[in-house]
Amino acid sequence: MPNHYDVIVVGVGSMGAAACYHLAKRGAKVLGIDSQQVPNTNSSYNGNTRVIRLTYQEHPDYVPLLRDAYLLWREIEQESGTKLFHKTGVLYAGFPDGEAISGVHLASETHNLPCSTLTHSELAKQFPQFTLPEGMVGALEPEGGYLLSERAVETYAQAAQRLGAALLTSEQVIDWSSNAQGVSIRTSDGSHVAAKLILCAGAWSGGLLRLPAVPLIVTRQVLGWVQPSRPELFQRGDFPVWNIDPHGDRGMSGIYYGFPMSNDPAEGNGLKLARHHPSTPMAPDEITDETFAADEEEILLPLRRYMPDALGQVQTIKVCKYTNSTDGHFIVDRHPESDRVHFACGFSGHGFKFASVMGNVLSELALDGKTQHPIGFLGLSRFANS
């Protein structure tokens, strides 16, 4: 007879590791299952660091969740004794009518968040590291910064185990079923049963969820580290996390973003930057860690255009995965097939910062059938007419 658990969590990545921790903290008997080791490079959180920010340009409804996320990141730092968050401020730059600048102002005004506005000349004076087109303006959020993503997943997984959670790695979930007695999970090595099931399998969510009306689009994204020609200009403490919306600047597209440099090897070697953009849909198993010449050009292009003092030798390129919903917003809800099953997916390249609070959300949904956190806008109902 297989062991019977209170909750099984499929996918021990960003959201799943945090869910295992919050479930175990409440005394639940938890099993986390992942097809890879934890942490691993074949993931959405690969690449050392992720941005965290409060003035959320994507939609102001995320801000209450972010406030809770900040508190819970501090909580796991204190409980584990592990540094995960660096507060550097986040600088946004773009044209006034672009989505980034207008979205940042909407979020800050809606939720009364600290955020200063910079004219083009003020931006050039305060941050001479950038050479931006005439007409671009800035917004500076003091509370933002970045998280150590792989270290955070490992920290949550280890904390969950200390609290009694069991983790099975390198074990692939093949299928699941649910009835009045509970849920059953069939894996590459056997089967497991539980009262409740949480599905948060990242790029592999589509096959497990069995929801054809809610397509998930998986894309390959690259992250690069460059050794700047003038590294002294880009050190943590003097240089913020940055985000440039090039909308309106000919030949540039997507969102370019990056991080300050530090001496911590957990953050990579050099100045990290990347491009947030739709990219080409792929099957998750088609995306490997192989890199190409075009990847290097994608990393260097924004430096040539906006940060000439950061140009230099590309040190490292890494690959991560986006799992995009059709509207770019997360999907967190009860599965329509069963009250015993909840899921989180479609984090669309901007989800990691929410891992701390999403773990709590998922634990409450599984154990209580509801959550105190405001996630209504992330539900399945918005796809009812799609």
Provide a role label for each language-model segment:
Residues 49-126, 255:
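Dinucleotide-binding Rossmann-like beta1-alpha1 core, especially the glycine-rich loop
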Residues 147-232:
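Predominantly flavin-linked oxidoreductase catalytic cores and closely associated redox partners
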Residues 24-45:
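Glycine-rich FAD pyrophosphate-binding loop
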Residues 121-125, 146, 281, 293-356, ...:
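Flavin (FAD/FMN) cofactor-binding core of flavoprotein oxidoreductases
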Residues 21-25, 83-85, 191-192, 196, ...:
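Active-site substrate-recognition segment that forms the wall
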Residues 16-17:
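N-terminal Rossmann-fold NAD(P) dinucleotide-binding loop
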Residues 2-13:
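Beta1/beta-strand and adjacent pyrophosphate-binding region of the FAD-binding site
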Residues 75, 95-169, 175-181:
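Flavin (FAD/FMN) cofactor-binding and adjacent substrate-gating region
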